[in-house]
Each structure stands twice: as structure tokens, then as C-alpha cells.
Amino acid sequence: MSGTLLAFDFGTKSIGVAIGQRITGTARPLPAIKAQDGTPDWTLIERLLKEWQPDEIIVGLPLNMDGTEQPLTARARKFANRIHGRFGVTVTLHDERLSTVEARSGLFERGGYRALNKGKVDSASAVIILESYFEQGY
């Protein structure tokens, strides 16, 4: 086991991507993947899996602040199930509440409005999701 994890912040137009190491508990953003109505370019995802060979995939689970599911929750679950079905890799869903808010805030602090590019926000959210997963001791 390499200890490498790949995280996705699922969205209908853009899917944020981050790579991280279990041993350090840190993650960094990778370029976001464009999606069309929630459907990604599966060849890009396959390339990411071949390049990074993660032990596990983390997919952010969008929930309302009270923990209930929202319309995007089922689509994120479906995305996670498809990754597992297509590539046979372990996929874990992880609560992503407030990850986008935190990502926007961090990017804005570092670069103002110009830094709030959609793909950058989505991949920064994926970093936050993965680091949150590590912080919970997984």
C-alpha cells in the first residue's frame, strides 16, 4: 500500500481533484475535471488512477448543514459507485459540509477575486475534504 489517496469534490459542471498522503496527512490540488451535467470524462479519471495509483478514493458527500441529504447527495453517491464499479478501487464518502466556503475564503485571502476560478475552488475543496478525512484519523 502506497498510502496515496485521491479525493474528488463532485459537481455537475466541475469536479475538484486532490492528491494526498496518509503518512503526512496532507493534500494538494490537482487540475479540476470538467463535467457535463455531472458526467466526467472517465478517461481523465482513469489516467489519474493510473498515474497516482491511490489506495483509496475519497468523494465529498454534500449534505445540508443539519446533516440531511440534498439533491446533489444522490448524484455524488452515484459518482462514487461508478468509480468503484469501473475501476475496482475502494471509495469512501466523506462529509464535505462547508468545504467550498473554506476553499473560497482561503483562495480569496491569497489572491483576491482573481483567485476564485471555479476549477481552483473545486480542487481546493477537494484538498479540504481529504485533509478533513485525515484529521478524523482515517
Swiss-Prot record:
Top-level taxonomic group: Bacteria
S-S bonds: none
Entries under SUPFAM superfamilies matching the protein: Ribonuclease H-like
Enzyme Commission numbers on file: 3.1.-.-
GO MF term (any one): nuclease activity
GO BP annotation list: rRNA 5'-end processing
InterPro entries, per database record: RNaseH-like_sf, YqgF, YqgF/RNaseH-like_dom, YqgF/RNaseH-like_dom_sf
Record has Iron as a keyword: no
CDD domains assigned to the protein according to its UniProt record, in alphabetical order: YqgF
Keywords carried by this UniProt record: Cytoplasm, Hydrolase, Nuclease, Ribosome biogenesis
Cell compartments where the protein resides: Cytoplasm
GO cellular component: cytoplasm
Function per UniProt: Could be a nuclease involved in processing of the 5'-end of pre-16S rRNA.
NCBIfam families per record: RNAse_H_YqgF
Similarity field: Belongs to the YqgF nuclease family.
UniProt protein name: Putative pre-16S rRNA nuclease
